[in-house]
Regions:
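Extreme N-terminal starter segment of soluble prokaryotic enzymes
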Residues: 1-5
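A short acidic/small-residue loop/turn micro-motif
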Residues: 129-132, 244-252, 261-264
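CN hydrolase (nitrilase-like) catalytic-core segments centered on the catalytic cysteine
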Residues: 81-98, 166-253
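Active-site catalytic loop in hydrolytic enzyme cores
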Residues: 104-176, 190-197, 258, 267-277, ...
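Short beta->alpha transition motifs characteristic of CBS
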Residues: 49, 114, 126-132, 229, ...
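Short polar catalytic/cofactor-binding loops
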Residues: 7-12
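Cys-nucleophile CN-hydrolase/nitrilase-fold catalytic domain and related Cys-dependent amidase chemistry
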Residues: 15, 23-118, 125, 189-208
Length: 281
């Protein structure tokens, strides 16, 4: 499976400009799956009056519900402007795309990450469980309540967003289903040593792959160094099959990291059966 991590320099709160760059990165990656950072089209903004999107139930889900005499639309994927644009790009370029966006809810909004497939389906949709109180996210966003796992290529995947990475119990709760964790982030350079250590730790303790995709460059007074990467089940940082730098890169760290991986998680867990020895405390 070819998966690409798009380490982008997000243009602050400019959805149209960032959407154009998303398409550039998708074209350049030439991968089955391209993943973008948290809040991909706006940056980590608390200005929900600018970033939040009013959403409707996903058309396919709604259509199926209308044929059901007792439809249950609770916790079903919804779609707003960003997701509709990404559906178009996914179809146009025959690529599965992971994108971060903000859903308007009352009284607080939700920080979402969605996986959109080439056929226009929302394969996975996750609301960040742990708002980052140190950065005042909790004052503008409510925490999600549901774990999110689903199929991503040849892997069963689990989603988490940025600050969630500091809570190992969330990841353990998605095992043994999850074979790869996707962690989009806006993680500043000042704490990047934590980012790298925690990505490796989540891989080791759950014996699975972990893909951390971070932004880069200067945004709203913060500097982001990127340091995106794919970690193997033994915690090692994998060497990309290739790195791609766009000619119009906005900073020196902006690039695509492309990996070719096979699902060997079951084999690894069987050979060194740590998870089966765990006791509930």
């Amino acid at each position: 499976m070819r998966i690409a991590l798009a380490q982008t320099n997000i243009i602050w709160e400019d959805k149209q400009a960032n959407l154009a760059r998303v398409e550039e990165f998708v074209i350049a990656a030439d991968a089955e799956i391209v993943l973008f950072p948290e809040m991909s089209l706006t940056g980590f903004s608390m200005h929900t009056d600018v970033t939040a999107e009013i959403c409707q139930p996903d058309a396919e889900i709604q259509s199926r519900a209308q044929m059901d005499s007792t439809p249950d639309m609770t916790n079903q994927p919804t779609t707003g402007w960003t997701i509709e644009q990404i559906k178009t790009l996914a179809d146009r370029h025959h690529t599965t795309i992971g994108i971060g966006w903000v859903k308007k809810t009352e009284p607080l909004c939700e920080n979402h990450y969605s996986i959109v497939t080439p056929d226009g389906k929302i394969a996975m949709d996750y609301a960040k469980i742990h708002p980052f109180s140190y950065g005042e996210e909790h004052a503008h966003f409510r925490g999600g309540e549901k774990l999110c796992t689903g199929r991503l290529g040849e892997f069963q995947a689990g989603l988490a967003i940025c600050y969630d990475l500091r809570f190992p119990e969330q990841f353990r709760a998605m095992v043994p289903e999850a074979e790869i964790f996707i962690v989009p982030a806006n993680w500043p350079e000042s704490r990047v040593s934590h980012w790298k250590a925690l990505l490796a730790a989540r891989a080791i303790e759950n014996q699975c792959y972990v893909a951390g995709v971070n932004c880069c460059g200067d945004m709203d007074g913060q500097y982001y160094s990127g340091d995106s990467g794919l970690y193997a089940p033994d915690g090692s940082l994998l060497v990309p099959t290739k790195e791609i730098r766009l000619t119009d890169a906005l900073c020196k760290e902006e690039k695509l990291l492309v990996y070719d991986i096979q699902n060997d998680v079951a084999k690894i867990r069987k050979a060194f059966p740590v998870l089966q020895d765990r006791k509930e405390m």
